[in-house]
C-alpha cells in the first residue's frame, strides 16, 4: 500500500477568492501587487557608490573593458545587459568577455588572466562583493593600473571591512538607503544603467527589461516586493506583446511554445526557459558557453551545425545556441538518471533511509550536478536531502528541503543544530558544509527524531465530485500571478469515481490521466509510477471494477480553448461499490 497523502486547510475556512489566497501568502496590498505602480521604483541615486561607479565609466571612456560572466542565469543576463548597454552608448573601445570554465563565482579562477590582459576597467556583475583578496592580486601583478567595478546583490563576507578599498562596489545589500533587498544581479545592473541614462540624457535601459525579468525569476527574487515585481512584469509585458529586443530569449520561448502556450508567465521563465540555460552552464564546454553569451547579446554572426537528415546547416547564433541548450538538457537528464541509480542503491542499503533526513555521499558525482541530484532525491524520498562529498576533513555540497514534510525550513533546521560551518541560500535550497567530525553528532540527533512519513499539503479549499469546469477555470485564469514567493494554490477534490477504462497511462508510465465532468486530471512523474499503477490494478480487482479517487493539485487552463485541467501533485485511491454514471 502506497502512503496516502494528508492535508491541512489554510486558514479557518475554505478560500474562494484570489485576494484571500494572496493575503494568506503575505501580500498586504493586493491591488498594487497585481498592478505595481511606477512610484514603487526606488531612486538609483540611493545606491552607495553609484556616482563613483559612473565616474569610473567616464574615466575609462573609449578604453578596453574586461567583463566577467557569472555562471548562472542571473550572471549571464547581467553581463549581457551591461555589454549591450556599453556597446550601444559607444562607451568602450573593446570588451573582452570571460566565462568560467567550471561552476565558480567571482574572479577566484580568473584573477591571473584579468591581471595580464590589456583592459583598463574590469566589470563584475552578479558577483565579486567579497573578492578583495583577488582584487589585491590583480592590482599587484598587473602591468597597468586597472579599475574594478562590481555590480552585485550578494552579501559581503562579514569578516571583511565594510568598505572595499580595491574596487567600487554597487550592491543593494550594502546600501542602507535601498529598501529593496530582493533585486538580483541583473536588477542591480539595470538600476546602474538607469542612473547612466539620466546622466547622459538617454533612455536605453528599459530595452533590456526582458533580460531583467529572466535573470530575476531564475535567481528566485522574491516578487512580493513591488519594485522587483514591477520590473519582471514590465519585461514579461514586452515579451508577450512581442516588443522585447532579446533575440535569444525569443528563440528559447519559440522552441517551448507547446509547453508555454500563448502567454509567457513568471512560472514559464523559471521552469521552462531558465533550466535550458542552466543545462548549458552545467554541461557545456567553454566554447558552448561563449556561444550562448553571444546569442544573449544579439550577435548577428551565423554558425554552421550538422543536423541529421539535412547535413551542415547555416543558422543564426541564437538558433545555434538554442540547439546546444536542447542537446545539453538531454545530456543533463541522462547524467542525473545515471548518477541516481547508484545513489538510490547506496541510500536503500543503509540505515539512512529510515531517518527524517536523507544524507548521500556524492563523491563520484560532478559538482555541477549536486543540486539537481538533491532535488531528485528529495522528490523521490519525500523528505529533506543533503548531498555532500568529503575534502580535507570537510563535507561540502547541497541541501534541498521537502516543504510538504515535517521540516518546513531545512536551512533553519540545520542552522539551529550549530553543527554546520556553512548553510547559505534559500530556506529549502542552499549550499552546505560540515566538519566530518560533526557528522556523527548530527546523525545521532537524527536517530533520536521521530520520522513521520506522512506528506502534508497545505490547501485552500476542498471540493467534492460535483466540481465543475467553471470553478476550475476561475482559479486557473490567474496562472500569470504566481511564482517567486507566491505559490500556486493547492486544492483537494474528493469522491471521483473511475473504472479502468477511464484511466490513461502513458507508454513511459510517467503520466496518468482521467477525466471527470470534462475536467482533465493528470499526474506527472520523473520516473515510472510503478507503485501507483500496481495499486490501481489491485483496487480495480478487489472491488466491482470501480475506484474512488481523491487528488490534491493545481487548477489550470489548457491550451485548447482554455479547457479545464488539474495538474495532480498526489493521489489517494481505494476500491468502491459506487458506480460512475454516464462517463462522469
For the regions a language model picked out, list residue spans one by one.
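Short gly/pro/ser/thr-enriched loop/turn and capping motifs at secondary-structure boundaries
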Residues: 104, 131, 154-161, 176-177, ...
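Mid-to-C-terminal polyanion-binding domains and interfaces
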Residues: 59-61, 226, 312-361, 365, ...
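Generic beta-sheet signal
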Residues: 125, 149-153, 170-172, 388
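Short alpha-helices
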Residues: 161-218, 425-426
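Hydrophobic helix-and-loop "lid/oligomerization" segment in the mid-to-C-terminal part
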Residues: 2-121, 139-146, 197-440, 462-464
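Catalytic metal-binding/acid-base residues of hydrolase active sites
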Residues: 72, 128, 154-156, 175, ...
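Active-site core of PLP-dependent enzymes with the aminotransferase class I/II
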Residues: 127-140
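Short amphipathic alpha-helical segments
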Residues: 80, 135-137, 162-163
Amino acid at each position: 500500500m502506497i502512503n496516502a497523502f494528508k492535508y491541512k486547510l489554510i486558514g479557518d475556512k475554505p478560500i474562494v477568492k484570489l485576494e484571500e489566497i494572496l493575503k494568506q501568502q503575505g501580500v498586504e496590498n493586493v491591488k498594487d501587487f497585481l498592478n505595481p505602480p511606477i512610484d514603487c521604483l526606488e531612486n538609483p541615486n540611493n545606491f552607495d557608490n553609484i556616482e563613483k561607479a559612473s565616474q569610473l565609466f567616464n574615466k575609462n571612456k573609449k578604453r578596453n573593458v574586461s567583463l566577467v560572466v557569472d555562471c548562472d542565469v542571473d550572471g549571464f543576463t547581467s553581463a549581457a545587459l551591461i555589454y549591450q548597454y556599453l556597446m550601444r552608448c559607444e562607451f568602450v573601445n573593446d570588451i573582452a568577455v570571460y566565462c568560467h570554465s567550471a561552476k565558480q563565482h567571482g574572479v577566484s579562477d580568473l584573477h591571473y588572466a584579468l591581471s595580464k590582459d590589456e583592459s583598463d576597467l574590469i566589470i563584475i556583475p552578479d558577483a565579486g562583493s567579497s573578492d578583495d583578496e583577488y582584487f589585491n592580486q590583480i592590482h599587484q601583478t598587473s602591468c597597468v593600473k586597472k579599475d574594478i567595478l562590481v555590480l552585485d546583490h550578494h552579501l559581503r563576507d562579514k569578516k571583511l571591512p565594510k568598505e572595499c578599498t580595491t574596487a567600487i562596489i554597487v550592491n543593494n545589500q550594502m546600501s542602507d538607503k535601498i529598501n529593496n533587498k530582493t533585486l538580483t544581479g541583473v536588477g542591480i545592473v539595470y538600476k546602474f544603467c538607469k542612473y547612466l541614462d539620466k546622466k547622459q540624457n538617454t533612455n536605453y535601459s528599459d530595452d533590456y527589461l526582458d533580460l531583467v525579468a529572466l535573470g530575476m525569476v531564475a535567481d528566485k527574487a522574491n516578487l512580493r516586493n513591488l519594485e522587483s515585481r514591477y520590473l519582471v512584469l514590465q519585461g514579461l509585458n514586452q515579451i508577450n506583446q512581442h516588443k522585447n529586443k532579446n533575440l535569444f530569449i525569443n528563440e528559447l520561448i519559440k522552441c517551448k511554445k507547446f509547453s508555454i502556450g500563448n502567454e509567457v508567465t513568471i512560472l514559464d521563465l523559471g521552469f521552462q526557459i531558465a533550466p535550458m540555460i542552466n543545462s548549458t552552464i552545467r554541461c557545456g564546454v567553454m566554447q558552448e558557453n561563449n556561444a550562448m553569451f553571444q546569442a544573449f547579446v544579439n550577435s548577428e554572426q551565423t554558425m554552421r551545425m550538422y543536423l541529421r537528415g539535412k547535413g551542415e546547416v547555416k543558422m543564426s547564433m541564437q538558433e545555434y545556441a538554442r540547439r546546444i541548450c536542447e542537446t545539453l538538457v538531454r545530456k543533463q537528464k541522462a547524467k542525473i538518471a545515471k548518477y541516481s541509480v547508484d545513489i538510490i542503491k547506496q541510500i536503500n542499503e543503509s540505515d539512512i533511509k529510515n531517518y527524517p533526513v536523507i544524507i548521500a555521499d556524492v563523491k563520484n558525482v560532478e559538482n555541477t550536478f549536486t543540486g539537481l541530484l538533491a532535488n531528485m532525491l528529495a522528490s523521490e524520498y519525500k523528505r529533506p536531502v543533503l548531498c555532500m562529498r568529503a575534502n580535507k576533513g570537510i563535507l561540502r555540497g547541497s541541501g534541498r528541503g521537502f516543504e510538504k514534510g515535517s521540516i518546513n525550513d531545512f536551512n533553519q533546521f540545520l542552522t539551529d543544530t550549530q553543527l554546520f560551518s556553512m548553510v547559505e541560500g534559500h530556506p529549502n535550497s542552499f549550499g552546505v558544509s560540515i566538519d566530518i567530525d560533526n557528522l556523527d553528532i548530527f546523525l545521532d540527533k537524527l536517530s533520536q527524531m521521530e520520522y513521520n512519513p506522512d506528506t502534508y499539503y497545505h490547501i485552500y479549499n476542498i471540493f467534492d465530485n460535483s466540481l465543475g469546469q467553471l470553478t476550475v477555470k476561475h482559479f486557473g485564469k490567474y496562472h500569470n500571478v504566481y511564482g517567486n514567493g507566491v505559490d500556486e494554490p493547492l486544492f483537494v477534490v474528493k469522491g471521483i469515481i473511475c473504472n479502468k477504462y477511464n484511466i490513461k497511462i502513458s507508454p513511459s508510465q510517467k503520466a496518468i490521466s482521467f477525466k471527470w465532468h470534462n475536467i482533465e486530471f493528470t499526474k506527472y512523474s520523473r520516473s515510472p509510477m510503478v507503485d501507483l499503477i500496481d495499486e490501481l490494478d489491485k483496487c480495480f480487482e478487489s472491488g466491482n471494477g470501480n475506484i474512488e479517487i481523491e487528488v490534491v493539485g493545481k487548477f489550470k487552463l489548457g491550451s485548447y480553448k482554455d479547457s479545464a485541467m488539474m495538474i495532480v501533485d498526489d493521489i489517494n485511491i481505494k476500491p468502491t461499490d459506487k458506480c460512475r454514471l454516464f462517463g462522469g
